[in-house]
Regions:
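Extreme N-terminal starter segment of soluble prokaryotic enzymes
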Residues: 1-5
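Short hydrophobic segments within beta-strands
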Residues: 7, 136-137, 173, 245
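A short, glycine/small-residue-rich beta-strand->loop->alpha-helix junction that serves as a flexible
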Residues: 7-17, 145-147
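Donor-binding and catalytic core of enzymes assembling or modifying cell-surface/extracellular glycoconjugates
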Residues: 12, 166-252
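Short amphipathic alpha-helix
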Residues: 18-25
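Secretory-pathway luminal glycosyltransferase catalytic domains
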Residues: 38-167
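Leloir-type glycosyltransferase catalytic cores
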Residues: 248-265
Length: 265
């Protein structure tokens, strides 16, 4: 069985896609896959969400730790473009695999298993959730610099589409607290009820993820974090309504991430 080292890199959304790709490579192509984190703490973060990992793992070590051997020098790293289909054959020289693996052919075969692993935490979080919750997620940070952040007009349009939103509380999530505060002020001024998740549980990306996964409707950002939370929500409740942007990212190939059941706003 050929060995293949798959690199872990990025936030939890990217890590879940990489984990799904590793399952595909091992279960369908019979590679012996090892997961290697490119920065410290990524394996621990992934395990927090999915529990025990079925692969051997390699913790982060600085590049100066490694001595290049003649054997490793003949092996190569293959970069998989984010939205490219899964390949069925790799050169014998390919030993290291990098990428975000966001084409359905990479994750579809293992999606049910990954969602099942995530669902344990969703069920626990559901005990603290109000009924008929609407979750709104805004991705900022590096998206602002890259020009990928979604305009307020998208969120306003999604809010205007659904007349049932005012029947329950709204929770706003983002990696930018200032944006959360400003958005909540806008919603309050419009007469909508704000649910402050921090009142019931310590705020963190982990708790935000599973709160979104328990919402009745979600106005999504174009992030993989929100993508996975919505997939988890709809896997356990087919009545969950999700609103998404009409184009995921400027790269048109990214639209493969848009589910046919989501409502474009």
């Amino acid at each position: 069985m050929r060995r293949l080292d798959l690199n872990l890199d990025g936030g939890i959304g990217n890590l879940l896609f990489q984990y799904s790709a590793a399952l595909k490579l091992q279960n369908h192509f019979e590679f012996k896959v090892s997961l290697k984190e490119l920065s410290p703490g990524l394996i621990k973060r992934l395990e927090k969400y999915v529990g025990e990992i079925e692969f051997s793992t390699s913790r982060f070590r600085s590049s100066s730790h490694f001595a290049q051997t003649s054997n490793l020098g003949r092996l190569t790293t293959k970069w998989e473009p984010s939205f490219s289909p899964c390949e069925t054959h790799y050169s014998i020289r390919v030993r290291f695999l990098k990428g975000y693996f966001q084409h359905p052919s990479w994750y579809q075969d293992s999606l049910e298993l990954v969602l099942k692993k995530l669902d344990t935490h969703r069920e626990s979080a559901s005990l603290h959730m109000p009924r008929n919750l609407t979750a709104i997620h805004l991705r900022r940070s590096d998206y602002v610099r890259l020009g990928w952040d979604l305009p307020m007009s998208y969120y306003d349009k999604a809010l205007a589409i659904d007349s049932n939103i005012n029947q329950g509380p709204i929770a706003v999530f983002s990696d930018d607290q200032m944006i959360v505060d400003l958005f909540e002020q806008r919603l309050s001024a419009a007469g909508l009820t704000i649910h402050n998740n921090a009142d019931s549980v310590a705020s963190s990306a982990f708790n935000d993820f599973f709160t979104i996964a328990n919402a009745q409707r979600v106005i999504m950002s174009n992030s993989t974090f929100c993508w996975w939370a919505v997939k988890l929500a709809q896997s356990s409740n087919s009545e969950v309504v999700a609103y998404c942007p009409s184009t995921w990212l400027p790269d048109q190939k990214s639209n493969v991430l848009i589910d046919s059941t989501w409502i474009k706003a």
